[in-house]
Amino acid sequence: MPARDWSANTLLMMEISGADSEKYRLVITSQPTVLIVRSTPNKTSPIVNLVRSNSLNEGRLYVAASGGNMMRQETNRLAIMTVLLGFFVIMLDTTIVNVSLAHIGKDLHGTTASLQWVVDAYTLSFAALLLSAGTACDRLGAQRIYLFGLILFALFSIACALSPSMGILISARALQGVGAAMVVPSSLALISEMYSDHKERAKIIGLWGAAGGIAAALGPIIGGLLVSTTGWRAAFWVNIPIIAVLVILTISFIPRWVPQASNSFDVLGQTTSIISLSLLTYLVITWGECGWNTAQLPALLVVLLCMGLFLILEWKNPTPMLPLTLFKTQAFSISSIVGFCLNFSFFGQLFVLSLYFQKYLGWSPWIAGLAMVPQATSAIVASPLGGRFSAKFDLYSAMFVGLSVGALGFSSLVVVNESTPYVLVALLTFCAGFGMAFAMPAATSAAINAVPYEFAGIAGGIINTARQTGSVFGVAILGIMIANGNFLAGFHHAVLIAGSVFALAAILVMLAKAP
């Protein structure tokens, strides 16, 4: 949390004695927020870790260093840099691995189906565990989950790098996805903890999105360089030194905030959630790869049964992993729908665009990867800009602007054919990516801001589950559009669907914003 001067907002201040014989000041401010501040400076440490946390309406109880500052400014910068870099390395790994698939198949004698599962196993475990990881942040503390997720991701990156067979690699990728599922929602929860001011938080979430955009842009380039010079295993080894530094920074500079949510563990809710999301993700992946057939009907019925059971259990549980009452808040529900739509269109279009370059134009994977860099780099500009726009105006306006620009960009790709100059394709894809990246910080901020502080972790889990589910559905549904034999017509249908989904989401946001 950034440094603050609480004196201007102080309503009541009294001195108390702590159990550690230290003198503290109890400070009640007009935020309303309660703080406990050391009466005497702690000269041995620039930061006093949080030891207790309670709610007072929307306020929080902190133990802070003398003067009321949660952190020194330089400590805060290191803490937020650690969070952003953690998200960066997760996104970097995803794009690097995609570039490495051909070399993995050649070295480990993998079939096309097994290579697809190198990606899909990670996607499945990541999507299935986001909700559980978000809940764990609220129950056990976001710093702890973030740290454990980084360590888990590093361990199974090593396992991937050492894999002697496709089976072991696919298993290691699935477990690597577990670590990623812990890092992503906990990074958002940590941002929420460090920045209680909504405008400042929106700016930081904009940087969070930019970190993902930079990773997506650099991934194909770094991956191509590593694979061509040292082999595909380097795509996994590259994670280790980065995460080693991140673990040290996390322990040193990110406070261990004491969670406010109940410590009770919703076993049935967790189990039905994981089964539902795992089966749903698996069904959509196989549907996109093989098409629909009646053999999948029993699995679909099991998914619907588990989802229904999950909702009933959560409704009746006094301390559920997923408080359904969160969806009564319009801003939270709208942001979750927008998150789904953003990833549905963007990643679905990204999939068909890569095939347009490779299958339709006949470009190599390396050249196709470079051709997609303009769209990936759009996030570097758009995410921070979207965060600042949200802070200056409002979240609904930022979502509407981003969705409108994205709808225009996606729909305009309908003019693309084999003779279209690449400069025009790059401009249109940049526009589509810009819209997505501009709207995403606002949607994420709206979800986090709409819930009580003690549910920041599960809020991050829900918005990221919505996004990840949107990605899986987008790739499957838009992928089907280009599988009918006439690639160009299918590509045009796919981008029109992507643009239409953005346009419908923009209309929904506009209606929600209207008084």
Model-found features: residue ranges?
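Helix-loop-helix hairpins in multi-pass membrane proteins, especially solute transporters
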Residues: 138-268, 453
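Central cavity-lining transmembrane alpha-helices of secondary-active solute carriers
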Residues: 120-134, 184, 188, 373-385
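Structural signature of transmembrane alpha-helices in multi-pass secondary transporters
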Residues: 122, 126, 177, 208-216, ...
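12-transmembrane solute porter fold
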Residues: 76-92, 97-99, 112, 229, ...
